[in-house]
Amino acid sequence: MKPTHVLRLLALAPGMLVAPAAFAGLIVSAPVDVIGNLPLATFTSRGYGTRTYKDWGNEPYIAVNPLNTNDILISSFSFNTSSTTMGANVFYSTDAGSSWTSQFSVPTPVNGLTIPNDWTFAYTSAGTLHGTVLGGNNIFQGATTDPASLAAWSYTGGGTRINTAASSGNADQPWIALQGGRVFVAYDDFHFNTAERIAVSTNNGTSFTIDNPINNGPQAVNTVNPGTRIATDNAGNVYSIFGTGSATATRGVHNVTYYLNRSSDGGVTWDFNGSSVVGGIVIDSGVSTQLCNMPACTQASNNWFANVNDLRGNITSIATDKTGSHVYVLIGKQDANGTDRIYLAAYQPLGTNLVKSSEIVVSPAGERAALPAITVKDDGRVVVMYETYGADGNVHVHVASSDDFGASIGSDIDEYTFTPLTLAQATGSTTSNREFGDYDFLMSIGDTFYGTFAGLGNVNAGGIDTTRLIDPFFFSGTDAVPEPRSLSLVLTGLAAVLWLRRRKKNMSEVLCRSCATGAGRKRRRWRDGRSQRVIERPLDTTPATWC
């Protein structure tokens, strides 16, 4: 080999040292069937497997205690306060999600009022759990230091609604986010047209003294649910996403426009109300299949997701990194072929503005996608969850990631696949329209992310059979970063290359792999036999050429 060839190989050594980070994927735990991992006595006594209602995972939400990440709460539509002499049921784990308990620990805020109609939860940095609950079309906020205790729960104002008087009896879909001592609760107000608002407490939920629109006020014509979602950063900002729509000639199909807004003063004013007539930055617009109301779809005739889930909470999600230097939104719209897909748009601050840096499609072509969720880990990596339904008749729950600030998707794992029940099988009702609910949810603490979704149970052992139930599932994950390569290993590899090239010069095209990245790189996916973690990394299959 000529000396110039040796230098060329040695010049690659620095790149070989840093290459593993670029090839990192995700390590995701096998999903845990929450109902399937309850104590047998609880499963039996509560009738999880014998009741007509089997939709225990409908609209799941997750909160993890940052002071002890073994403590995990998952909520869903399981037992409400009218079906128990105690509180409404949440699922609680104290061993990082390996096993679960049913805790009837969320009391009604007002005697005689049934909850929940909707609810979302979040932990403070001090380990206090906050929750916002919809009951009687009003919004309530409460907190507890012990999610397993009914007596430990307390509500703002002793059970006083926190939504405005004008919206009383017409509020919907509360969404919670925390920031220091602030508690933000976004909600929809249907008392006059369609409005999106935010209620704010500046004293850890003791009182709510701010309640303002997150845009320029009610929209006179809106044929979709706004899907109002919020997220906060550590720089004092709160961000919102919502959608507005107008009907097309096809029922359940709308022209939808999505908006992003930001408040830098705790929800008092919103920075981009002047950016559009509605108020907020226009993220994008397109045709979207959701909310089949005019005329209403039925179980026998519909265009619902997977034929069992009308999307009545829009197709939206939002997250930001801690510093507010990157804001990410997920939206749903059709591609050029008429397939409903999930899109990821990334924004960065530029002066006082937010500027879109990229927008990409996340979900695969030819498969309808819905129920997106997103989080940003402390290392800046973006993690996305979404569901698809295709010609195979199965729902596929995907976990994808981006390590270049949303410019591309680096990995996409098919975390769970199942065949949905019919709605009548899941709910015992011939008029129900949602088997999975309005959302899935992702969150992260440090560089670990946690997620929940509704799916067909997969446990049939020890007297517990969940294979005919729709259950909440739990999973967690982190980065699959290969161990650092030492310089000695690199030099050993180079020596081997030199030796092989001397033995067989015509093998150079085999030994000198391509430097190509991006679309030419496929993924390798396997599940570790001991931990049952899904591991995925890129697999270079591009033609071998000299770099």
Where are these regions (language model features)?
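Bacterial N-terminal signal peptides that target proteins for export
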Residues: 2-10, 486, 504
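C-terminal PAP-associated
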Residues: 25-480
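A short, hydrophobic C-terminal helix/tail in secreted or cell-surface proteins
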Residues: 483-501
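C-terminal membrane-anchoring or membrane-association module
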Residues: 498-515
